[in-house]
């Protein structure tokens, strides 16, 4: 079993620290300072970094981390080749911490965005999927983003999902506006408000939960997804 900890960074980022014993893998380091502090405080060995896509709020910590750990294994798609020395492709399989890690194509937000699924248990999805939402489609390729969501929907419902941003409350306000009222949505929104009032993360989430509250996962076809995405972009 892995110990997974969110390292808060910037205004709303989570850098995920995946820990096994005294070793740690870092996902999408937007800032090196909190990562280095976390490693030092917990006396950990940094063994690898996983990058999901090439936006600065996921990679800005890389220069400092690579200067400290020049031999580090860094996994990521071609669009982060300036930092990654292990280029991954969709449906590649890695072995990390004795887990089979599947690389899932998650394009749309960026052209080569990927997600990492640890043994059908833990999904690190960057900006492809949020609690109650999904990433903006900066590429304009709505088909790719819709297809990514279908891949996520096909996973076991017990999978824990680790997005890179704390967007849950704003996403749930949109969900409340476009979905039929439900006990699940009300209860999850209430829980999220309590957690944020205590400055605690609302993440991780689960696929089971997201299927109940995430409008984008409920879109039945591409046209409905595009309409929802345009609504959210202007919400």
UniProtKB/Swiss-Prot annotation:
Please report a single Pfam family linked to this protein: Lactamase_B
| Cofactor: binding comment | Binds 2 Zn(2+) ions per subunit.
Could you say which EC number(s) this protein's record lists? Answer: 3.1.2.6
Xref: CDD domains: hydroxyacylglutathione_hydrolase_MBL-fold
Q: Which residues does Zn(2+) 2 bind? A: 57-58, 127, 165
Q: What GO MF annotations does this protein's record show? A: hydroxyacylglutathione hydrolase activity; metal ion binding
Per UniProt, Zn(2+) 1 binds at 53, 55, 109, 127
Which pairs of Cys residues are joined through disulfide bonds in the record?
none
Kindly report, in one word, the top-level EC class recorded for this enzyme: hydrolase
Cofactors named for this entry? Zn(2+)
Q: Which UniProt keywords apply?
A: Hydrolase, Metal-binding, Zinc
Instruction: Give one GO biological process term.
Output: methylglyoxal catabolic process to D-lactate via S-lactoyl-glutathione
Iron-sulfur keyword on record: no
Which pathway is recorded for this entry? Secondary metabolite metabolism; methylglyoxal degradation; (R)-lactate from methylglyoxal: step 2/2
Q: Does the keyword Flavoprotein apply?
A: no
What does this gene product do? Thiolesterase that catalyzes the hydrolysis of S-D-lactoyl-glutathione to form glutathione and D-lactic acid.
Q: How does it assemble?
A: Monomer.
By what name is this protein known?
Answer: Hydroxyacylglutathione hydrolase
Organism annotation? Actinobacillus pleuropneumoniae serotype 5b (strain L20)
């Amino acid at each position: 079993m892995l110990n997974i900890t969110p390292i808060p960074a910037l205004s709303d980022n989570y850098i995920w620290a995946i820990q096994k014993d005294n070793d740690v893998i870092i996902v999408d380091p937007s800032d090196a300072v909190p990562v280095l502090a976390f490693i030092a405080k917990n006396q950990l060995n940094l063994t690898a970094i996983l990058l999901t896509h090439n936006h600065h709020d996921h990679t800005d910590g890389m220069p400092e981390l690579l200067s400290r750990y020049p031999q580090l294994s860094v996994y990521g798609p071609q669009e982060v080749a300036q930092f990654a020395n292990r280029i991954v492709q969709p449906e590649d399989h890695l072995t990390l911490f004795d887990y089979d890690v599947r690389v899932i194509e998650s394009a749309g937000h960026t052209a080569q965005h990927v997600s990492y699924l640890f043994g059908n248990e833990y999904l690190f999805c960057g900006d492809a999927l949020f609690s109650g939402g999904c990433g903006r489609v900066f590429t304009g390729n709505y088909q790719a983003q819709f297809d990514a969501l279908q891949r996520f929907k096909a996973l076991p419902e017990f999978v824990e999902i680790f997005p890179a941003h704390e967007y849950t409350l704003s996403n749930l306000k949109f969900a409340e506006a476009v979905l039929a009222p439900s006990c699940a949505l009300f209860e999850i929104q209430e829980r999220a408000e309590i957690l944020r009032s205590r400055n605690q993360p609302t993440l991780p989430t689960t696929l089971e939960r997201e299927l109940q509250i995430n409008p984008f996962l409920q879109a039945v076809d591409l046209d409905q997804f595009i309409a929802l995405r345009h609504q959210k972009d202007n919400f």
